[in-house]
Amino acid sequence: MGLRFLGRGLLLVPGYLYPVMQLMADQDMLILDDRKSGDLQSASDRQWHLVTDGVMGGVSDGRLAPGEMAGRPCLHLQGEVRLENNGGFIQAALDVPDTVLAGITGYTGVSLEVYGNGEQYNLHLRTRDLWLPWQSYRMTFRATPQWQTLRLPFAGFEPYRTGRALDVGRLKRIGIVAIGRAFNADLCIGKVGLFR
């Protein structure tokens, strides 16, 4: 017996029942976070966390908190990206639970609702195949000062400092990153999921 979706919010894995994710009615979207928690907890039962270049001696300053933008709940990533000491990033990171990987077949990319300040940001994917902290698969997007839904196909992600092809079935972490140049980051993140 294989994986089956039993309706809204339930995934049947042989021997287990996981209330780990919500599916939209059309089942074309697997929701990782819908921002209904009011805190840093995601809909996929993992906490969002802030990662900055301080882990490598950088001095960028970042904040990550639940918030609201234009009447919608969001995760608010703010801060100053600075380049001193070989730094240059702040990141909202979400680890992907194994229960999501069990049902990932057939999904073709990441859907992201964002409201920004007109700056460019990156979406980074890390898999279990990457061991070095700077390795990832990356795609750049511009976040305009209005809510928009971005659909970023897995096929468009570029490997960064790795020769391995992206294996989505080994996805470990999703990172929404302000990176690479000195600027003020101000990004609201709404619903995050995978699309077919």
Language-model segments: what does each one mean?
Residues M1-R196:
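Beta-rich carbohydrate-recognition modules and glycan-binding surfaces
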